[in-house]
Amino acid sequence: MKIYYEDSLPYAAEFFAGLGDSQVFSHKDVNGELVADADVLLVRSTTKVNAELLKANQNIKYVGTATAGTNHLDKEYLRSRGLDIHSAAGCNAVAVAEYVLSALFVMAEKLDWQLTTKTVGIVGAGHVGTRLTEKLTALGIRYHLCDPPLADAGDTRDFVDMDTIMQCDIISLHVPLIEGGQYNTGHMFDAKRIGQLRKDQLLINACRGEVIDNKALLKSFESGYKLNVVLDVWENEPDIDQALVPYIALATAHIAGHTVEGKARGTEMLYQQVCEQFGFNATKKLSDYLPAPQPSIITLDETLSGQAQLSALVLSVYDIRKDSKQFKETIEQPDQFRYIRKNYSIRREFAALSVNTGNYSGSEAIYALGFNRK
């Protein structure tokens, strides 16, 4: 069996060794001729899988993406070939939720907010939105959920409408890109909805760039409209509108889900799917390959308490300001968006770390965030 995998899949060589003849490729070089004899094709969002790529391949039996999103897969074409759509839905949900927490604590400091007095409106209650609700609950932060497709499908959680979301202090977007139809999310935040935002609100987009009309957002800023916006995703990536960048409070290069665990978990999920489809025993686990974080134990600063303590802890693991600073200072360089994503620094999830809480009274909140006890 011929297995071709993109070079950006962490630990793919280790996971797929022994399942067949494994070949690695770069998204920059991949073409139909290169993968013409592939039985299994494993990609990330940088490789578009369509008729052009697979027209010369008569062997393909499995196509999988080690990402939660599938917009780079031509689903109609793959189904016409009798191929299911395989993805790693939820693989980076924890990572994105922790990215949002970092943004919240940074913006709370900037805006002099006590987060427990604020309400977060979460649009999209799938994998990421659900993980975010768990983190917010641990911190005692109120939230509302809006997800019409899930509500209509019978999900029994307490959902609100977008009018209610627009009244929240913080709005965090976690929807898939759906263009057209009843549940359209393309330009969900168009000029009209952007115009409804208040200067004392915070808007976070860590899902798909096209969910916010970037041209309308830029026009609002240029007209003097004051908004607090955090963007990890942009329209027309990687060729984004650089004129928008200086106006964004925290700006990053679509890396919210790029923890070591988040990316590698996608590879593990594809490994499990391939084993199931082809009758192999899935004996390998992500924990077999993940390195121990350095340091692996965090000791709380006993001079801090409350939000300051939690903020210091979260930002010691991941401080979004560093990524935003690099992004803003270098994005004008050629192909920098891709470069940042490709060469992203090591970032670990809370669950990889243990915390020595000492006599801190809020230790249960820390463990509920996902940290381990020391």
Curated annotation (Swiss-Prot):
* Enzyme Commission number(s): 1.1.1.290
Give the matching Pfam families. 2-Hacid_dh (PF00389), 2-Hacid_dh_C (PF02826), DUF3410 (PF11890)
Signal peptide location: none
Which InterPro entries has this protein been placed in? Answer: D-isomer_2_OHA_DH_cat_dom, D-isomer_DH_CS, D-isomer_DH_NAD-bd, Erythronate-4-P_DHase, Erythronate-4-P_DHase_dimer, NAD(P)-bd_dom_sf, PdxB_dimer_sf
> Oxidoreductase among the record's keywords?
yes
Keyword Cytoplasm listed? The answer is yes
**Can you list the GO cellular component terms from the UniProt entry?**
cytosol
The subunit field of the Swiss-Prot or TrEMBL record says: Homodimer.
Q: Which family does it belong to?
A: Belongs to the D-isomer specific 2-hydroxyacid dehydrogenase family. PdxB subfamily.
Q: How is this protein named in the record?
A: Erythronate-4-phosphate dehydrogenase
Naturally occurring in which organism (per UniProt) = Pseudoalteromonas atlantica (strain T6c / ATCC BAA-1087)
